[in-house]
Amino acid sequence: MRARPEEATDKTVLAAAYAILARSSHSRAQVHDKLERKGFPGELIENCLKRLEELGYLDDEQVARRWTQVMLRERCWGILKAEQKLQQRGIKRDLARQVVDEAQREFPQIDGARQALAGRFSDRTKDVPLAKTVNFLRSRGFCGEVVYAAAKEWEKNKIG
């Protein structure tokens, strides 16, 4: 439903933003884009976003931390993919890098790579070639050093 510019008020924009945020966490950029697609004027959108930030309903750092925890711990993604996904969701590059670096200290990448391998290649797949494990980890966004350490460890453990 597109808003008519002559009918748009601070209240209507704020109500639309509340509806967006009620469904799930969003970055500032995502809320801006969704309100813009609904046809609200830029000035009203900016006023709304400022108000949401003042109220604490819109906080890119908090959202980035939450998303990063999910990506690294639950989805077993590497830092490269997590950082890329944060930026795609409207988190600024510097903030994305900072949040991912902090999360990495709590949850080392080698642990995430081990979990990813264990989840993808169970005991039934002992004959998985090393190249396949390497490619899988790289597709999950793990850096080269972690990929090769985890893949070598996986290879050693399946033989031994």
Q: How should each PLM-predicted stretch be described?
A:
Residues 1-160:
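An alpha-helical, amphipathic repeat domain used for nucleic-acid recognition
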